[in-house]
Design a protein with these regions (language model features):
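Short, Lys/Arg-rich, polar N-terminal cytosolic tail immediately upstream
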Residues: 1-18
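Hydrophobic alpha-helical transmembrane segments
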Residues: 22-29, 53-54, 89-94, 137, ...
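C-terminal membrane module of polytopic membrane proteins
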Residues: 218-286
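Structural signal for the C-terminal ends of transmembrane alpha-helices
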Residues: 65-76, 203-206, 262-269
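Alpha-helical transmembrane segments in multi-pass membrane proteins
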Residues: 30-72, 91
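Membrane-interface helix/loop boundary segments of multi-pass membrane proteins
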Residues: 150-175, 202-209
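Functionally important transmembrane alpha-helices
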Residues: 33-40, 177, 189-246
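Juxtamembrane helix-loop-helix connectors linking adjacent transmembrane helices
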Residues: 48, 77-147, 165, 238-240, ...
Length: 286
């Protein structure tokens, strides 16, 4: 046996590890570049929601296509195109409902450190607040259909599959969730998006189905749209959605939300299969 192989057993592994990170970063930058370019062109013809939809769809879909082509595996394996049990939907809904309060408080703590500019806050509210059924359906299509499909195919599909090939299951999930948070660019969203990305990654890994991630992503995005659209004018003084003051979630509600989330996640874990999706088995074997 060559002595150099004994002295440097990990030398050959360094290149694929570097390529794994580089590949994820290149896909992210490609998604940004193409997305911003497409949104810039669309802005001449469409409003804010339209340009967001075009940029998101074009950028992420193109990078997903590139990622699948370079993965050297069938698209069904890379993207985990497999159904999941409908019995998982109830715990997913409960996780999304309770988890929204927890992640909202993470955002509040972030805002205490780094205040959100009022113009940016108004932009967020403009996306989430719908006046009338037609606007609600438009925003629901963007937040609970288009975004979950394109973002899950990219991050829990191509990127996570590639990272798992290099780093193994849970490290691949962790790195892909960080990429998901960074992709959102805005600091007030990045921390929460990273946490949500980790949860979505675990769900896809446990079930072996990208559709589980899409469903959870859609449910999670739908809750704030419903709440802000329905109760925007009914919030008590000091708790308005456009208030300049950071209002924290009450501690009893946080404790209740934490308990519900733990119960729902435990139920999901029990009902979901172990990570035995063929694509992930091959990925970890590589």
């Amino acid at each position: 046996v060559d002595s150099e192989e004994i002295n440097h057993p990990d030398e050959d592994l360094e290149l694929p590890r570097l390529m794994g990170i580089k590949f994820a970063v290149l896909l992210m930058f490609g998604g940004w570049g193409v997305g911003f370019g497409a949104a810039g062109i669309a802005s001449y013809f469409l409003g804010m929601q339209g340009t967001t939809a075009v940029g998101n769809t074009v950028g992420l879909c193109l990078m997903t296509f590139v990622g699948v082509r370079f993965s050297a595996r069938p698209a069904r394996e890379v993207l985990s195109l497999k159904s999941f049990s409908p019995w998982l939907i109830p715990p997913m809904v409960l996780m999304a409902f309770s988890g929204s309060f927890l992640v909202s408080e993470v955002g509040n703590l972030t805002e205490e450190i780094l205040p959100v500019p009022q113009e940016l806050k108004k932009m967020f509210l403009g996306i989430l607040q719908a006046d009338g059924v037609e606007q609600f359906l438009q925003r629901a299509a963007l937040l609970s259909l288009m975004a979950p499909v394109t973002e899950e195919l990219m991050f829990r599909g191509v990127i996570m599959f590639g990272l798992i090939r290099v780093y193994g299951g849970y490290r691949g999930i962790l790195i892909s969730s960080i990429c998901f948070g960074v992709f959102h660019l805005i600091p007030w969203q990045a921390v929460g998006a990273t946490l949500i990305g980790g949860l979505l990654g675990v769900m896809v890994y446990r079930t072996g189905s990208i559709f589980a991630g899409m469903a959870m992503h859609a449910i999670w995005n739908l809750f704030p749209l419903i709440v802000i659209s329905a109760f925007h004018d009914m919030a008590p003084e000091g708790y308005g959605f456009d208030s300049e003051k950071v209002t924290h979630v009450p501690i009893p509600l946080l404790i209740l939300s934490g308990g519900l989330f733990y119960f729902a996640f435990k139920r999901f874990w029990k009902l979901s299969a172990q990570p035995n999706e063929k694509g992930f088995e091959i990925a970890e074997g590589c």
